[in-house]
């Protein structure tokens, strides 16, 4: 059995590129970026057909299949890393604070975050509950502010499907007005 290293590298790179693009495209679809996702899918399927044909035409060498699978696994990982760095969309953070007089809402507002707060009651008494909508690109900074100001906070994050009105609508309108003046 002859091992063609150039072919193995090519198979790995093609499947790595295909799956990386596939992962990013899937996440674009989930976040509603239809046009980018459609464009990515055209490139993705072209790469897929190339890679699959290379492997299917060389099934006599099982190492080709192993390298194809390795490219797949690495592609999924890298695709997720890319999506994490792009940080598309928004995150909704719910924070429950044991101290109803916590300074955290003020700290978050001073740092540009919109915060809705209301009184809550838990097993051990009164609590303060915060709801914060933030772009995912600011998520790590937000978590850092929460951890610094309220290390005992209970934090839950989830991805909103639909956003309308409120703090974000006002902010977007102000930003658009500033751009028109420039």
Swiss-Prot record:
Top-level taxon of the source organism: Bacteria
Location of this chain's protein in the cell: Cell membrane
Pfam families: DUF2179 (PF10035), DUF5698 (PF18955)
CDD domains from the UniProt entry: YitT_C_like_1
Transmembrane intervals: 1-21, 36-56, 62-82
Alphabetical keyword list: Cell membrane, Membrane, Transmembrane, Transmembrane helix
Primary subcellular site in the record, as a coarse category: membrane
Family: Belongs to the UPF0316 family.
Protein name per its UniProtKB record: UPF0316 protein lp_1140
Source organism per UniProt: Lactiplantibacillus plantarum (strain ATCC BAA-793 / NCIMB 8826 / WCFS1)
Taxonomic lineage from the root: Bacteria, Bacillati, Bacillota, Bacilli, Lactobacillales
């Amino acid at each position: 059995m002859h091992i063609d290293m150039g072919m193995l590298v090519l198979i790995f790179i093609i499947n790595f590129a295909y799956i990386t693009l596939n992962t990013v495209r899937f996440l674009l679809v989930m976040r509603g970026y239809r046009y980018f996702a459609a464009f990515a899918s055209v490139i993705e399927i072209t790469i897929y057909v190339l890679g699959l044909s290379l492997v299917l035409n060389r099934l006599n060498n099982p190492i080709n299949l192993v390298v194809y699978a390795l490219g797949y696994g690495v592609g999924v990982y890298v695709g997720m890393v890319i999506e994490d760095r792009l940080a598309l969309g928004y995150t909704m953070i719910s924070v429950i604070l044991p101290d109803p007089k916590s300074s955290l809402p003020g700290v978050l507002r001073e740092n540009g975050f919109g915060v809705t707060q209301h009184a809550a009651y838990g097993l051990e008494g009164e609590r303060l509950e915060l709801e914060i909508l933030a772009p995912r690109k600011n998520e790590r900074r937000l978590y850092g502010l929460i951890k610094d100001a309220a290390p005992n906070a209970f934090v839950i994050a989830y991805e909103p499907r639909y956003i309308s009105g409120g703090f974000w609508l006002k902010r977007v309108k102000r930003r658009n007005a500033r751009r028109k003046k420039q």
